[in-house]
């Protein structure tokens, strides 16, 4: 199986203000990377999301940069791809920032392909599910227009529905 195409798409949508305790988030944002293969199998990865305050149109040029390094490679060689694209290019692009986020999306897309090729979910490839996990919910913060009733409802929902 070989990579034939790497696509980059940017999505943005309006949503009600969501407060994280530090500031209100703006619109929803997502950068999606799709990796396609010569066998018709494809994988998707993404970055951006709730805290993506930077303009997402800066992500596609990084995908363009990595595309020529990916086409023709075996997408199931996730470790080799991570080493070649991340570790070998760290001197050019640096150890963090946009390139790291794009590499994460590419890596997730390749893991998605690997899982599909082996008939397993990505979580199974990474060791399976746990019967219990610790959780954390932030909330109960003041926001303009939020009274005690709304605060109580938020906390009630978090305890009853989220745990």
Stretches with model-predicted labels:
Residues 1-51:
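Structured beta-strand/loop patches that form or line metal/cofactor-binding pockets in enzymes
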Residues 16, 96, 139:
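Catalytic cores of transferase enzymes with a strong primary signal for eukaryotic protein kinases
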Residues 32, 112, 155:
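Short glycine-/small-residue-rich flexible loop motifs, especially phosphate/cofactor-binding loops
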Residues 125-132:
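Flexible hinge/switch segments at interdomain interfaces of large molecular machines
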Residues 36-117:
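Metal- or metallocofactor-binding catalytic centers and their adjacent structured scaffolds
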Residues 111, 127, 138-140:
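Beta-hairpin (beta-strand-turn-beta-strand) motif
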């Amino acid at each position: 199986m070989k990579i034939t195409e790497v696509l980059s798409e940017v999505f943005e949508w309006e949503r009600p203000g969501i407060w994280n305790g530090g500031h209100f988030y703006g619109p929803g944002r997502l950068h999606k990377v799709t990796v396609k293969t010569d066998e018709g199998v494809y994988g998707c990865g993404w970055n951006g999301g709730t805290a993506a305050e930077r303009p997402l149109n800066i992500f596609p040029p990084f995908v363009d940069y990595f595309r020529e390094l990916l086409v023709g490679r075996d997408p199931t060689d996730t470790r080799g791809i991570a080493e070649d694209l991340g570790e070998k290019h760290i001197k050019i692009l640096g150890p963090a920032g946009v390139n790291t986020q794009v590499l994460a999306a590419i890596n997730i897309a390749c893991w998605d392909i690997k899982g599909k090729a082996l008939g397993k979910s990505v979580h199974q490839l990474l060791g399976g599910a746990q019967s219990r996990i610790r959780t954390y919910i932030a909330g109960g913060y003041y926001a303009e227009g939020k009274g005690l009733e709304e605060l109580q409802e938020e906390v009630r929902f978090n305890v009853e529905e989220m745990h």
